[in-house]
Structures are given as structure tokens and as C-alpha cells.
């Protein structure tokens, strides 16, 4: 455990940021999985789920949780999957 006041604060802020980042990444992964599952099942709302997944990916990328290249790659693969 840290003793210095600034170190205590850093631990708190790091834990808070970690929780927020984990939540955001989880939302992104869930949105992508929902799209994949709906596409496999042939659901009607695939287009809407695609848009939600792309939005979640863009949000994660803008917050620095994933790199720009990964975001582009994931969106490209999903778009190709949607077109099939």
C-alpha cells in the first residue's frame, strides 16, 4: 500500500480509470458479438446492430482504448460480413 498522499491518489484514479476503460471495452465487444450473432441467425435488425457496433468501436478508438488500425480493421471486417 502506498504511504505518500500523491501515490494514494494515483492508485484511486488508476482504479477508477481501469473500471471505466474495462466497461467501455466490454460494451464494444458485446456490440460486435450481438452483430455477429444476429448476422449468423439472419435477424432483421442486422443493419441497426452493425451501426451500433461501429459506433462502439469508434468510441473506444477515440478514447484510446484500441488503436486506429484495429478499429479500421474491425469495421472493415464487419462491413464485409454485412455485405455477404
Swiss-Prot record:
Entry-linked Pfam families: Ribosomal_S20p (PF01649)
InterPro entries (UniProt xref): Ribosomal_bS20, Ribosomal_bS20_sf
Cited SUPFAM superfamilies: Ribosomal protein S20
Keywords linked to the UniProt accession: Ribonucleoprotein, Ribosomal protein, RNA-binding, rRNA-binding
GO biological process, one term: translation
GO molecular function: small ribosomal subunit rRNA binding; structural constituent of ribosome
Zinc-finger among keywords: no
PANTHER family xref list: 30S RIBOSOMAL PROTEIN S20 (PTHR33398), SMALL RIBOSOMAL SUBUNIT PROTEIN BS20C (PTHR33398:SF1)
Similarity remark: Belongs to the bacterial ribosomal protein bS20 family.
Name of the protein: Small ribosomal subunit protein bS20
Organism: Ligilactobacillus salivarius (strain UCC118)
Lineage: Bacteria, Bacillati, Bacillota, Bacilli, Lactobacillales
Gene that this sequence comes from: rpsT
Amino acid at each position: 500500500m502506498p504511504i505518500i498522499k500523491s501515490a494514494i491518489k494515483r492508485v484511486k484514479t488508476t482504479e477508477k480509470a481501469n473500471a471505466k476503460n474495462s466497461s467501455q471495452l466490454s460494451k464494444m465487444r458485446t456490440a460486435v458479438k450481438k452483430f455477429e450473432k444476429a448476422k449468423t441467425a439472419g435477424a432483421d435488425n442486422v443493419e441497426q446492430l452493425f451501426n451500433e457496433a461501429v459506433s462502439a468501436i469508434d468510441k473506444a478508438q477515440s478514447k484510446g482504448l484500441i488503436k486506429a488500425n484495429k478499429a479500421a480493421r474491425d469495421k472493415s471486417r464487419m462491413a464485409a460480413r454485412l455485405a455477404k
